[in-house]
């Protein structure tokens, strides 16, 4: 008699995805982030659901409802800070997951990669709308500035912005619809994650060598379930340290001031995980040019498979490409720092140089250095 997990229509899917799934024997801890992202998503949906039970999406009461939650609801502050810092952990895992894909050439699985890019955009949109909900100063002005960027689109821009706002400024209608979308999108993300996994399981996982591992596979359970639990414990430890010791470290103090359309904060900036894109946006003096660069800074990932000129898939044995990769990482950290600084010299010029370097590394230098490496290996 076959095991129920192998014969039951529903359990069979779970079994083939998480238990008997053949996985390469050599995948390192860089492959842990997929499961960590799944846990982050589940945590965000769970904490978000309980937060939504206490939140009111009305400009008059939104700020007070969040304050009430933190002061008067049992462990409400834990829920709130788990959700806020959980988003930070989500993005740390996301960026490491994408970085792993770039380093080891996982983008050659184009379907999985493209769904991943759509997921990244969706998660970013969800996080942006979530930041607006507490209706503090940075929430209001962040929403105003970022939605206003759409007005740079020729001809339809102004109408589009007013349509998104539901009026002539960010107001009650905007807050209500942002709450509706912020609640809905994580469930759409969950469905897209399943599609992401579906495409991944069509090809199987990549591995650090970049060489097909069909001849050397091991079952996902117990080997990688145990390995994933270790990663999970480390992530939960970091998250709890953030939540319990310095819950506001990654937030903005301006968001503890209720939204006031009549007073602009001295430095409007998004959450830390958007600062690199914000720096690229600000580095171009033209509004439309800035918006295009902002979108391209993420969308450029979609052409990675086309820019792959190396005869090897992974960067594991390509020291020159490795140097460029870590230069790209350093450049992104520089952009993140610049995004949080005021618009004045020397920050303006540093931001512009870092933005040029970002696009140059990906579009020009990486494909060129790969060709050089091919030549050095006489391929």
UniProtKB/Swiss-Prot annotation:
Binding positions for heme b b562 per the UniProt entry: 83, 182
Listed cofactors: heme b
Residues annotated as transmembrane: 33-53, 77-98, 113-133, 178-198, 226-246, 288-308, 320-340, 347-367
Coiled-coil ranges per UniProt: none
Gene3D superfamilies: Cytochrome Bc1 Complex, Chain C
InterPro entries: Cyt_b/b6_C, Cyt_b/b6_C_sf, Cyt_b/b6_N, Cytb/b6-like_sf, Cytochrome_b, Cytochrome_b_C_euk/bac, Cytochrome_b_N_euk/bac, Di-haem_cyt_TM
Name of the protein described by the UniProt record: Cytochrome b
């Amino acid at each position: 008699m076959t095991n129920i997990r192998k014969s039951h229509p529903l359990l069979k899917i779970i079994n083939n995805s998480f238990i008997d799934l053949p996985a390469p024997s050599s995948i390192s801890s860089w492959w842990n982030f997929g499961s960590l992202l799944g846990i982050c998503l589940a945590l965000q949906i769970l904490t978000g659901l309980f937060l939504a039970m206490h939140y009111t999406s009305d400009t008059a009461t939104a700020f007070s409802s969040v304050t009430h939650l933190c002061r008067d609801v049992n462990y409400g502050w834990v829920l709130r800070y788990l959700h806020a810092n959980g988003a930070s952990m989500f993005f740390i895992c996301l960026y490491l997951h994408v970085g792993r894909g770039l380093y080891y050439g996982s983008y050659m699985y184009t379907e999985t990669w493209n769904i991943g890019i759509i997921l990244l955009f969706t998660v970013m949109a969800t996080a942006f709308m979530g930041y607006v909900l507490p209706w503090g100063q940075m929430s209001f002005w962040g929403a105003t500035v970022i939605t206003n960027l759409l007005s740079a689109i020729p001809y339809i821009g102004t109408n589009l912005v007013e349509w998104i706002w539901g009026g002539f400024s960010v107001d009650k209608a905007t807050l209500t619809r942002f709450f509706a979308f912020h609640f809905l999108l994580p469930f759409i993300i969950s469905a897209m994650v399943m599609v992401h996994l579906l495409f991944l399981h069509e090809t199987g996982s990549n591995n650090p060598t970049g060489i097909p591992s069909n001849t050397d596979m091991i079952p996902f359970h117990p080997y990688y379930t145990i390995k994933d639990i270790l990663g999970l414990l480390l992530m939960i430890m970091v998250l709890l340290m953030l939540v319990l010791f310095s819950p506001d470290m990654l937030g903005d103090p301006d968001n503890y001031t209720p939204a006031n359309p009549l007073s602009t904060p001295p430095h409007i900036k998004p959450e830390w995980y958007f600062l690199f894109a914000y720096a690229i946006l600000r580095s171009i003096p033209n509004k439309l040019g800035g918006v295009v660069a902002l979108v391209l800074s993420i969308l450029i990932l979609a052409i990675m498979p086309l820019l792959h000129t190396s005869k090897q898939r992974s960067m594991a044995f390509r020291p020159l490409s490795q140097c460029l990769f870590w230069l790209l990482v350093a450049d992104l950290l520089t952009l993140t720092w610049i995004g949080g600084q005021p618009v004045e010299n020397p920050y303006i010029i540093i931001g512009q140089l870092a933005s040029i370097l970002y696009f140059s590394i990906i579009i020009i230098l990486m494909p060129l250095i790969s060709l050089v490496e091919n030549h050095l290996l006489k391929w």
